[in-house]
Amino acid sequence: MQNQPAVRELPGSWPPEHTIWLNTGAPMPLLGLGTFRLQDKETVRLSLNAALENGYRLVDTAAVYGNEAAIGNALRELLPHYGLSRKDIFLTSKLSPRDHGEGPAEAACLHSLQGLGCDYLDLYLIHWPGTQGRPQEDKGNRERRQQSWRALERLHESGKLRAIGVSNYTVRHLQELLASCRVPPAVLQVELHPELAQSELLDFCRQKGIHVQAYSSLGTGQLVRCPEVVKVAERQGRTPAQVLLRWAVQQGVSVIPKSASPTRVAENSQLWNWNLTQTEMEELRALDCGKHYCWDPSGVV
């Protein structure tokens, strides 16, 4: 039986109503800044500055994004300007699919810590259930990700990873992991939006105490032009992006919208003190057609 860490105090800069609690006893903000495709150092700095100014306290990156060092440098520069320190920021990174396996996964995680200039991460995810260079149907994918998870468990137990989780896993992948792990995943990060509502996955994760975090909440930007979304936004006096993000948050799903525009970063933070009606939630859910704008992991053995 794993020893769960004690429930930790909420940092003073995190409003309780904007926070969820993971199965590790750690708090996690419901809103974070995604950084996919933010690589230029100045773009990273401007986006992070706008995020911190508008109350974001979670930053999501990954080894494959190629921006861990830029994010680490920007945070060291910016945090003191807002009276914040490392403990005020929930920092997530992810294992590259090329680094699956026990030894490679541990080395990759330590490399991410070095790049970010941190001695711990709040959350570290297996980015993809398959191994780069292996066909999706290769049964070796299963063994490699199990080996990676063992490495993450050790790093979690050593304190370098406060929580561990997975990204792009299906119910099948999660069932397999839960049958063999010592430390259960705290978070599942997946593509989730009205056209890909992930109802079965959400129900499964709720039953197992795994928090679901959405990426591509705007459908890579295309859903902001969807007539049904625009109608709800006009009715609410909100932007389509705010409606899409609120739709997830209102289900208890955290969101990590990405933008290089400080104005949009600010707009995306305005998710509180208003609600979509039950009818509006259902109108948006009716758009569900199983559409992936990003990657579909269902074919990975």
Model-found features: residue ranges?
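Generic structural signal for well-ordered alpha-helices
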Residues: E17, L48, E68, G72-R76, ...
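Acidic (Asp/Glu)-rich catalytic clusters
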Residues: L22-N23, G72-R86, L113-C118, L178-C181, ...
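CE4/NodB-like, metal-dependent polysaccharide N-deacetylase domain
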Residues: A105-I126, R154-S158
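N-terminal binding-site loop/beta-alpha segment at the start of enzyme catalytic domains
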Residues: M1-I89, G219, G299-V300
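Active-site mouth loops of central-metabolism enzymes
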Residues: L31-E42, K94-E102, P135-D138
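A short, structured active-site edge motif that brings together acidic residues
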Residues: S85-D99, L123-P129, E191-L192
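Short, acidic/polar
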Residues: Q39-L52, G101-L116, R172-L174, L196-A197
